[in-house]
């Protein structure tokens, strides 16, 4: 559980935020599990921070280097950059459709990123943390290429998982090397690899082990899954890790004698959080402002990642920052989710198990998916997406509890008022109800600050339930004018509070709600404690959401199959993405 003290600094430093989402590998469109584990959760938390008025930068981008892209480009007879240019464009469009708004969504092919990575590794090399070693590495005689770790698959020596990659077992999370695998195979063609001699450059993690252990043990903000996994790896002892590869597609290694080598994609991609911040402020014409974030002890750096990415963010990335010899602020915490599974199974494109970001947005508006995914976020255990649960959340909670309450209140207010009266006050009974809502608001705020986004949504729903209960029991339309005005004033104030607590989760709907309530500009978190402003001109209310029937679901599933039939016909990856026509 996250320590709330991250929202204040005991030494009086100004608190700033760098929010980083795991960079999507743009070999393909991300699925819902990818989104909830990183991009969507990071967007929701960033929106909360901005509502609070914090100085925050949300950075992420397209991870486009490495063997998978290189191999796919060879198969298609095109250059890797041709593939990544098109896929990057598609991801940018999808993020806009989903309402995911990084301050800088960049790419690992950006000139700033390539410059920063080479500069950082030059400093690390000059500081003596890098050495060379001649290794026998897996080489596929059929494909005639050296195989990066992740392109060797076999049985994990720790847990027996038969499809472990040569860099990490996705089942138990252990960091691996290809030689550790039992019965290794080439992931491209299935051939048994040969071992051939080649020279590579290594990061000597052993020399950084004590500092990394001290950093992790002393960090009360790390969630349990991240802390325990990291300490488990440290207990076994850190080993040097090869940071170069024989790929052509990547960032050229800057070390003397390393011509023809590129930086291993995992070691350059994590540095993207810094390079993306630099690039963001360069675009704003504020060249040195990035230092206010990365060299300020009051900065809170938080990563939104899946649990399989924990070691790269709690061990590798801090190690790289330490090895530069510069006084970087260390990452404060990770929000490392468990897995989202689909109808009890792992997401699988080939078996059509799951839903992908492009498919989802073709079926329903983004806020339906955003609400459900955050409501069902796998924060402490795996979550299971089922169509039945999706219908239940959309129909019973999103529409009936939240949407229906808002629409009933706005309809009453518009019908009797049109404009919020200037002399209206809450009677004592209504003040007590409003006070209970403000108590729940405190809990919602705590949940956001602990990055328990699922709990924040659940508590927001409780606010709507209080309003619905009041409407059903009090029946304001039967009251005297004074009591009616008090009731609607209180209920409109509850709607205002509710809208702010849900604004990070369903921004499209809340912006429309604010328009209907008469707000020309967006609200801030502090406004959630203030009653509705008098004099607001109300617009004609429209329902924010609608129910989805079983019959409509069947139509959606049929459309989903049709979309996938279209995607399957595409030769190129960008032809296998489904985007609405502009």
From Swiss-Prot:
One Pfam match: Anticodon_3
Motif ('HIGH' region): 24-34
Protein residues bound to Zn(2+): 156, 159, 169, 172
Chain ranges for the short sequence motif 'KMSKS' region as given in the UniProt record: 346-350
InterPro entries: Anticodon_Met (IPR041872), Met-tRNA_ligase_1 (IPR023458), Met-tRNA_synth (IPR014758), Methionyl/Leucyl_tRNA_Synth (IPR015413), MetRS_core (IPR033911), MetRS_Zn (IPR029038), Rossmann-like_a/b/a_fold (IPR014729), tRNAsynth_Ia_anticodon-bd (IPR009080)
EC nos: 6.1.1.10
Annotated signal peptide: none
Gene Ontology biological process terms from the UniProt entry: methionyl-tRNA aminoacylation
Binding site for ATP: 349
Localization, UniProt: Cytoplasm
Cofactor binding note from Swiss-Prot or TrEMBL: Binds 1 zinc ion per subunit.
CC per GO annotation: aminoacyl-tRNA synthetase multienzyme complex; cytosol
Enzyme class: ligase
Molecular function terms from GO: ATP binding; metal ion binding; methionine-tRNA ligase activity
Catalyzed chemical reaction(s): tRNA(Met) + L-methionine + ATP = L-methionyl-tRNA(Met) + AMP + diphosphate
Cofactor(s) required for function per UniProt: Zn(2+)
The entry's keywords: Aminoacyl-tRNA synthetase, ATP-binding, Cytoplasm, Ligase, Metal-binding, Nucleotide-binding, Protein biosynthesis, Zinc
HAMAP family: Met_tRNA_synth_type1 (MF_00098)
Membership in a protein family: Belongs to the class-I aminoacyl-tRNA synthetase family. MetG type 1 subfamily.
NCBIfam families xrefs: metG (TIGR00398)
Function in brief: Is required not only for elongation of protein synthesis but also for the initiation of all mRNA translation through initiator tRNA(fMet) aminoacylation.
PANTHER family according to UniProt: METHIONINE--TRNA LIGASE, METHIONINE--TRNA LIGASE, CYTOPLASMIC
Stated name of the protein: Methionine--tRNA ligase
Species per Swiss-Prot/TrEMBL record: Caldivirga maquilingensis (strain ATCC 700844 / DSM 13496 / JCM 10307 / IC-167)
Protein's gene: metG
């Amino acid at each position: 559980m996250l320590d709330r003290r991250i929202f204040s600094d005991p030494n009086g430093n100004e608190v700033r935020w760098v929010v980083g989402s795991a960079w999507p590998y743009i070999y393909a469109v991300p699925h819902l599990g990818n989104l909830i584990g990183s991009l969507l959760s990071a967007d929701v938390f960033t929106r909360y921070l901005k509502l609070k008025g914090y100085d925050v930068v949300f950075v992420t981008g397209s991870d486009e280097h490495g063997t998978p892209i290189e191999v796919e480009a060879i198969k298609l007879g095109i250059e890797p950059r041709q593939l990544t240019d098109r896929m990057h464009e598609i991801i940018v469009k999808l993020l806009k459709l989903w309402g995911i708004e990084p301050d800088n969504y960049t790419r690992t092919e950006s000139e700033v990123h390539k410059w920063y990575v080479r500069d950082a590794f030059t400093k690390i090399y000059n500081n003596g943390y890098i050495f060379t070693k001649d290794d026998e590495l897996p080489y596929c005689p059929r494909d005639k290429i050296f195989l990066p770790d992740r392109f060797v698959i076999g049985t994990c020596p720790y847990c027996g998982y038969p499809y472990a990659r040569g860099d990490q077992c996705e089942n138990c999370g252990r960091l691996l090397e290809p030689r550790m695998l039992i019965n290794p195979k080439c992931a491209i063609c299935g051939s048994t690899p040969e071992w051939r001699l080649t020279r590579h450059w290594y990061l000597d993690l052993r020399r950084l082990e004590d500092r990394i252990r001290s950093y992790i043990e002393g960090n009360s903000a790390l969630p349990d899954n991240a802390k325990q996994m990291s300490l488990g790896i440290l207990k076994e002892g850190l080993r040097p890790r090869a940071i170069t590869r024989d790929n052509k597609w990547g960032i050229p290694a800057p070390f003397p004698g390393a011509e023809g080598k590129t930086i291993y994609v995992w070691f350059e991609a994590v540095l993207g959080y810094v390079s993306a911040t630099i690039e963001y402020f360069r675009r704003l014409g504020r060249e040195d402002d990035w230092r206010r974030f990365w060299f300020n002890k009051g900065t809170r750096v938080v990563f939104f990642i899946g649990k399989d990415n924990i070691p790269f963010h709690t061990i590798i990335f801090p190690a790289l920052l330490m090895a530069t010899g510069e006084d970087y602020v260390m990452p404060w915490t990770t929000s490392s989710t468990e897995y989202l599974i689909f109808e009890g199974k792992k997401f699988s494109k080939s078996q059509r198990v799951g839903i992908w970001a492009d498919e989802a947005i073709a079926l329903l508006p983004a806020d339906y998916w955003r609400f459900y995914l955050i409501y069902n976020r796998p924060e402490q255990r795996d979550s299971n997406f089922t169509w039945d649960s999706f219908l239940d959340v959309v129909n019973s909670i999103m529409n009936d509890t939240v949407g229906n309450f808002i629409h009933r209140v706005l309809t009453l207010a518009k019908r009797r008022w049109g404009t919020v009266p200037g002399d209206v006050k809450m009677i004592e009974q209504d003040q007590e109800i409003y006070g209970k809502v403000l108590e729940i608001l405190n809990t919602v705020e705590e949940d956001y600050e602990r990055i328990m986004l699922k709990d924040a949504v659940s508590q927001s729903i409780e606010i709507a339930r209080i309003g619905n209960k009041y409407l059903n029991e009090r029946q304001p339309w039967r009251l005297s004018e004074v009591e009616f005005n008090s009731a609607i004033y209180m209920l409109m104030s509850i709607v205002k509070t509710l809208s702010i607590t849900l604004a990070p989760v369903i921004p499209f709907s809340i912006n429309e709600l604010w328009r209907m309530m008469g707000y020309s500009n967006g609200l801030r978190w502090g406004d959630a404690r203030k009653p509705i402003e008098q004099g607001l001109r109300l617009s004609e209310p429209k329902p924010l959401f609608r129910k989805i029937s079983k019959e409509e679901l069947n139509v959606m599933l049929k459309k989903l199959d049709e979309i996938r039939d279209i995607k399957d016909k595409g030769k190129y990856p960008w032809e296998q993405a489904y985007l609405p026509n502009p």
